[in-house]
């Protein structure tokens, strides 16, 4: 921990490490992160790291998680010119993904990751 200035720096590094693992498993698809396979992968990762995510969320680090997810999606999908209204698509998606994941993970007996991913994909596919 000597190389970090704060606890948050340590947590952000851990979040980034998980996102890099995700990047290595992503499916190549013209739809990018919005593809069905990558939505399923997203929810499987949320499920795999459920305790870690919920601990961070309940400790007040939800924005740190969301900001890192936003940065990750920007790095994968690219950014739009600041004058383009289309830039909001990415943030609509990441916000919906993260919020849905938190509510889903908070349930005592959450539905299967594939089921929530399928539901999410059907509802979000027009974004």
Predicted regions and their residues:
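Short amphipathic alpha-helical interface segments enriched in basic and hydrophobic/aromatic residues
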Residues: 23, 27, 47, 74-77, ...
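Amphipathic alpha-helical packing segments from all-alpha helical-bundle domains
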Residues: 58-95
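Hydrophobic alpha-helical segments that form the core
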Residues: 85-107, 111-125
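Short, structured helix-loop boundary elements
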Residues: 8, 12, 16, 32, ...
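Hydrophobic alpha-helical connector segments
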Residues: 26-52
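Short, residue-level hotspots on alpha-helical faces of the histone-fold
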Residues: 13, 17, 59, 67, ...
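An amphipathic alpha-helix adjacent to DNA-recognition modules
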Residues: 1-27, 47
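Secondary-structure edge/capping motif, primarily at the C-terminal ends of alpha-helices
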Residues: 29, 53-56, 104, 108
């Amino acid at each position: 921990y000597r190389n970090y200035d704060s606890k948050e720096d340590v947590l952000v590094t851990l979040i980034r490490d998980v996102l890099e693992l995700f990047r290595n498993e992503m499916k190549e698809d013209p739809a990018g992160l919005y593809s069905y396979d990558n939505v399923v992968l997203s929810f499987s990762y949320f499920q795999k790291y459920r305790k870690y995510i919920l601990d961070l969320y309940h400790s007040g680090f939800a924005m740190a998680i969301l900001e890192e997810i936003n940065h990750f999606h920007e790095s994968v999908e690219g950014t739009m010119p600041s004058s383009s209204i289309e830039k909001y698509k990415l943030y609509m998606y990441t916000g919906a993904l993260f919020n849905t994941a938190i509510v889903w993970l908070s349930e005592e007996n959450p539905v299967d990751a594939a089921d929530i991913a399928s539901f999410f994909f059907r509802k979000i596919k027009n974004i």
